[in-house]
Amino acid sequence: MDNVKLVKNGVLRLPPGFRFHPTDEELVVQYLKRKVCSSPLPASIIPEFDVCRADPWDLPGNLEKERYFFSTREAKYPNGNRSNRATGSGYWKATGIDKRVVTSRGNQIVGLKKTLVFYKGKPPHGSRTDWIMHEYRLSSSPPSSMGPTQNWVLCRIFLKKRAGNKNDDDDGDSRNLRHNNNNNSSDQIEIITTDQTDDKTKPIFFDFMRKERTTDLNLLPSSPSSDHASSGVTTEIFSSSDEETSSCNSFR
């Protein structure tokens, strides 16, 4: 599917009715990890763009929607690890603590998510805006056998819509369940998981050609011939080994 080009001139172009709404785990495992490992992507849907080359309102794409970019981190100082996040009109400033992104099956740590807020002006006297960036990076470096790789990160950028009395440090992301550790140490990290085990959260599928309702996704007809009025819904089972392994060889 990598041959399907959904990005034109740095702008995401999806067919009518399609939405790109990935989870944190999908962004890290299916896109960022494959990009770092130079493996085929599920689709050419995320453009490469240095997000610090332009102010957030000048980045390619629709300002009213979330925008995704593969970007590289430029060191602020020659021998330092801090990233240079200055733009023409301001700078991106990290807020809160980095959050671990874990797999929904196995709870394996696959990446880290950093939240940044855009400030207009020069530090430390810049004025805060409502522009938010989620910067995803892998939790571990690729194996040395892969050779030198670029310092890729995946960025999600959007304009936060303010609602009354919300915490200023709220990153506007409600996709995942968050489990906070009460430890107040400076290296505290929140864990993000996409697993939902509560039966109430399972979708209910209705087969309008049958009288029974199926609430268990694993309940399938024993034989196609046993019910000629079946809706024809099939279930695909994916192995979690490709997602949970830390090696880039899983994509080859």
From Swiss-Prot:
Biased composition (Low complexity): 180-194, 219-252
GO MF annotation list: DNA binding; DNA-binding transcription factor activity
Expression induction: By abscisic acid (ABA) and salt stress.
Biological process (GO), any one: xylem development
Expressed in which tissues: Expressed in xylem and phloem cells in roots and inflorescence stems. Highly expressed in senescent leaves. Expressed in roots, and abscission and dehiscence tissues, such as axils of bracts and abscission zones in cauline leaves and siliques.
Region spans: PEST-like: 213-226
Residues covered by region (Disordered): 165-194, 217-252
KO phenotype (gene knockout): Accelerated leaf aging.
Keywords: Activator, DNA-binding, Host-virus interaction, Nucleus, Repressor, Stress response, Transcription, Transcription regulation
DNA-binding stretch(es), residue numbering of this chain: 110-166
Family annotation (Pfam families): NAM
Every NAC domain range: 14-160
Disulphide connectivity of cysteines: none
InterPro entries referenced in this protein's UniProt entry, alphabetically: NAC-dom (IPR003441), NAC_dom_sf (IPR036093)
Miscellaneous notes: Over-expression of NAC083 inhibits protoxylem vessel formation in roots.
PANTHER family: NAC DOMAIN-CONTAINING PROTEIN, PROTEIN CUP-SHAPED COTYLEDON 2-RELATED
Protein name: NAC domain-containing protein 83
